[in-house]
Structure formats: C-alpha cells, structure tokens
Amino acid sequence: MASKEILFDTKAREKLSRGVDKLANAVKVTLGPKGRNVVIEKSFGSPVITKDGVSVAKEIELEDKFENMGAQMVKEVASKTSDIAGDGTTTATILAQAIYREGVKLVAAGRNPMAIKRGVDKAVESLVRELGNLAKPTRDQKEIAQVGTISANSDSTIGNIIAEAMSKVGKEGVITVEEAKGLETTLEVVEGMQFDRGYLSPYFVTDPEKMVCELDEPFILCNEKKISTMKDMLPVLEQVAKMQRPLVIIAEDVDGEALATLVVNKLRGALQVVAIKAPGFGERRKAMLQDIAVLTGGQVVSEDMGIKLENISVADLGTAKRVVIDKENTTIVDGAGKGDDIKARVKQIRAQIEETTSDYDREKLQERLAKLVGGVAVIHVGAATETEMKEKKDRVEDALNATRAAVEEGIVPGGGTALVRVAKVLDDIKPADDDETAGVNIIRRAIEEPLRQIASNAGFEGSIVVERVREGKDGFGFNAATGEYEDLIGVGVIDPKKVTRIALQNAASVASLLLTTECAIAEKPEPKKDMPMPGGMGGMGGMGGMY
C-alpha cells in the first residue's frame, strides 16, 4: 500500500482553498450575458468551446492531490446543481467559493467552524423561504421564452423554440434535443403516442411511395404473448372484417402461419390489417401495452388477467382516430380511451416516479407519462461545424432545464438580483453566539458575489453595481446585457426560483463541509526514478575508421 501524506488545520484548508479557487476562477468567467468562452482541449477531435459552467468544471483535474480534493468538492456542487435544476452551475460554484473563502479567514482567526456552519445553515434556510415569497408563477409562453433565452446566453431563437415546444406538449411532455442535418434549428412535434416499433412485414404498407401504413379509425388489439397460429385469432378477425374497419395488432411477436395469413388477407383486400411488435421488454412491455390499452379504450389480452385471445370480441378492442406506422415507429393519434381511466393511469405513473430511486427507471416512467398526457417534441439543433454544434446543443439543454424549473417553482428577478433582494431577512435571524453571527455574515457577503461577477464580466465595477441594486425594490436590478438599471422582470431578465434555490443550498452544503475539515489525507506521489544508462551495444568492435 502506498504511503500517505497527511495535512492538518490551516495547512489542509489552505491547500483545499487553492484548489477551490483554481476551479471557481475558471468557471466564473462564463457567467452572465457578457460572460466569456472557455476553450477545452480534447485528446481526440477538435477543441470544445463552451460557456457552460458544469462542462468547464468537469474537465478540471489538478496535479497537487490536496488542491485537487478542493476542486473535486466544488465540481460536485456544479454537477449536483446541474442534475437537480439543470442550470445555475456557475452561480453555485461562485457561491461555494465565496462562502469558503470568507469562512477560512474566520476559522484561521480562531472562530469555531461548527458554530459558523450552524449560522450558515440558518441563513440559507431563511433565504430559501424568502425566495419562495419573491417568486412569481410563469404566466404565459412569453415568460417561458424569456427564461430559455437568458439560460441560452441571450439567444432568443432557442428561447422561442423551447417555449413553443412546451406550449405544444405541455409541461410534462417529453422534449428531446437532437443534432440536425442542416444549419437551421427546428422543432418537430409528434402528437399522440409514439413508440419505436414498426410493421413486421413491408407488405402491410398502404402508401408504397413513402413506405408507411396509415389507418383511419382502426381497431387496436393488444396481446401480451406471441401469436403463431390463426385459430385463436379467427373469431375476432371475422367480427372486424364484417364491420369493414382496419385492425392494428400489437403483440410480443406475430410469426409463422399467423403472419402469413394476415399478409395474404391484406394483399387480397379481404382485411386491412397490420401487425406490430410490442414496445419494451419484460415488465416494461406489459406496462406499455396497458398504457396503449388505456389510451385507446381497450383491454390487454393477458393470461394474468384471465383473458384469452379466442374469447375476445370487438368490445375488448381499443380504437383511435388514426394510426401511422413506418418501418421503425408507430404513432397512435387521438385514442378513444376514457378521460377518467387515463387520469387514473397518469396518477399511478406519477406515484411510481416519486417512489423510484433509479434514474433510468425514472426517465422511462417520465417518457410513458408524456406519451399519455401530451406528446413528444424534438428540437433539431443546426450548426455549421461540429464544435459549434456541441456548444449550441449544451446551451439548448441548459435552457430546456431552466424553463422546466421555471414552470415548476416560478420565476425571480435574474442577473444575481434575487439573492441581493432577499438578503434583508438575514437581519431577523437570532444567532446563539458571535460565531453563528459570523456564519450569517458570511452568507450576507457571499450572496452578492454572483451579481458582482456578472457586472465584472460585463466590464462594470461590481461593488458599485451591488450597492445600487441593494437600494432598489422588487424586480429592480442591473441588466448586464444593456448596462442599464431597470425592472428586470419587466424586460424579461428572469431566473427560475428553483435554480437559484438549489445553487445556494448546494454551495452552502459543500462549503460548510470544507470549512469543518481539520485533516486531509492523500497518497504521496512516488519519486520519479532516473532512467538507467543504456547498455553498450555488443558486436560493434572492429568498426573503426567509420566517420
């Protein structure tokens, strides 16, 4: 086992502090509308240019083990804020640096770090409560677009596309970001339920040019097991044929005699039919078939529920206004399911989302929820080069997360103003002793830091800007994009309250942990051994006279 190096007290905190500063200083140049870019070398491919705080933080590894520990702790602030709120990573990093920097001085001067931590926690709790009072719910599409624009570094095209996507699929709809083939950034909305399974045979297509199968007012049969023989299906097929309506069969698989018979009937024109594999696998497949059945007002043919294929009638089938199937996807538009049944199913999925601990399961449940309630929107991001594409895609994803957060918890004045505006509640805190008071004062100074940095990045004197904003009321603040002092909510400079709250809580949490650190342990770097002298080459004798 390699030997360890141990640092105590001031020396440990000094090294950690140096690491915190190195990471935070690299990240904070990106803050605000006039924030600068950071260029990151990649071991392969072109360098990445970004203004995304968490992307910068993730790239930083320091040579000194102790400094690196400090940097990694602050990196966690950025990552955690990004995971929960999706934005606000730079703000969180700046707050963590400011809290730790102020706290280290006080601990070095003999203050009790545990009491300081208690003061910090009390201050953060009060500020979070006051942020809730300051927040206003998002009223319309315009405000959602403004949040998206601010988060995408003042790119109004991105803000407007996200607002349009949200208005079309609802706040619980799925919005995904993909790379476009061209230069334009566009929005594509898939209405109804779509899943990634296509027709089992190309003979089912109704439009040979487009190679798609479009059916109007079809019956929809959901079957949990594989269908290989025809005899089980004959009763229901005869009933559907009599009514002269199309039929969509969704099953684990359809093969052999069953598939051949369906294809022959389709080609002869006896029955307009299409067979599709059910989406998903295992338990998820069962759940998705049940979703389709609820959406279309049908029953899942399942032995678990005591329903057999040979016993079903047309009454057990679902229906929809239209079903479109291509080689890879199926879209069910306007299913005929009862509103109450769909609501009950949605409630059940929401409960599962709350309970699950797996990120993957949560994502899949949210997709199912979106397919039931709204639909799916895809933002195709266009750019001229691969480097620009990566940078733009990052900004779109940030903006998308910020708008979701705004819809969830409301909006507050942007540009670092909200934290300055709620600082007055810190006067009402009753600390137990002087050390707790010091903790409250650390937060009082730290929450001004994001505004100071935004002003500094825009070429203004931070202290003067902070003083002027502190004198104002409500939404009055500094618009760094124009250099004006104005009502920020009125001109659309707004932040999601959730992003501001999460950034503050995460920053205070990690900075407090660092402050109460008394000892740091890291592996000793191994001394570099000198390269041995190369040995003489044998057999070189008798070669004199060579020049």
Curated annotation (Swiss-Prot):
Residues that, per the record, bind ATP: 30-33, 51, 87-91, 415, 479-481, 495
Source species, domain of life: Bacteria
GO biological process, one term: protein refolding
GO terms under cellular component: cytoplasm
Group of enzyme by EC: isomerase
Compartments reported by the entry: Cytoplasm
Single GO molecular function: ATP-dependent protein folding chaperone
Primary localization: cytoplasm
The protein's Enzyme Commission number: 5.6.1.7
Matches recorded under Pfam families: Cpn60_TCP1 (PF00118)
Keywords, in A-Z order: ATP-binding, Chaperone, Cytoplasm, Isomerase, Nucleotide-binding
Catalytic reaction equation(s): ATP + H2O + a folded polypeptide = ADP + phosphate + an unfolded polypeptide
Function of the molecule: Together with its co-chaperonin GroES, plays an essential role in assisting protein folding. The GroEL-GroES system forms a nano-cage that allows encapsulation of the non-native substrate proteins and provides a physical environment optimized to promote and accelerate protein folding.
Subunit details: Forms a cylinder of 14 subunits composed of two heptameric rings stacked back-to-back. Interacts with the co-chaperonin GroES.
Protein family: Belongs to the chaperonin (HSP60) family.
Name of protein: Chaperonin GroEL
Gene: groEL
